[in-house]
Amino acid sequence: MTTDTFHDLETFSPTPLKNGTHIYAEAAEVMLWAFCVEDGTIYVWDLVNNSLHWIDDLAECWVSRPLLEGVLPHELSEIIDDPEMLVWFQNGGMFDFVVLQRALPAVLDRIPMSRWRDTMVQAFAHSLPGSLDKLGEVLNLHEDKRKLKRGKALVQLFCKPRPDGGRATKDTHPVEWQEFIEYAGGDITTMREARRLMPSWNYKGKQIELWHRDLVVNYRGFAVDVELAQAAVRMAARVQAKLAEEVHTATDGD
């Protein structure tokens, strides 16, 4: 029996995302990795400061513990290495997988493609909005609009270079960094609730197999005969020049 786990990455790259995911990912860094198992405790792994954060149910506040640099928290490692754990991301197929290929390839290698799932793809498969905030509106997940606005501001602060070329960090913005951690945890709450409320009849079995196959093709790419392609470009240029000359002759230069 499989178990759903939910994940969200907060990343930084000096390259704007609008330039394309693969170009963005070439220099991307994973700063935070939020995750949970079904309705269990939500954890946020701070890779920049080597710590793990979660809400203490008794104290009703965020607590943390230090981690060794480069070592996954055992809570996440157990998920990654358990073949019965399905790994859900929001737009994970076209973003998080690509980023992990570059930033944490050794971790990605431990998660077979067959265990990947995507709440955005599930939403699109049922004619629902893909973005998490719009999906939340449709599913009546009454999110605090102020928190959403604040979260977007934190993403702007930490996930992009500053106008002067510098970078905001926990050292420069300690209060905002803690807010950023809590924001990452909040996205997990929305994602798992959306997964629970969405239909799944168009995102199971054969449909998921086809989605996995599509991802493999996208990641692998396809072979191109470069010499033939370049010859086609040259041929097109010659034909266009010939047609332009014919039009010029037929219209007496008009």
Residue ranges: model-predicted function:
Residues 39-200, 206-211:
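Active-site-proximal helix-loop-helix substrate-binding element of RNase H-like nuclease domains
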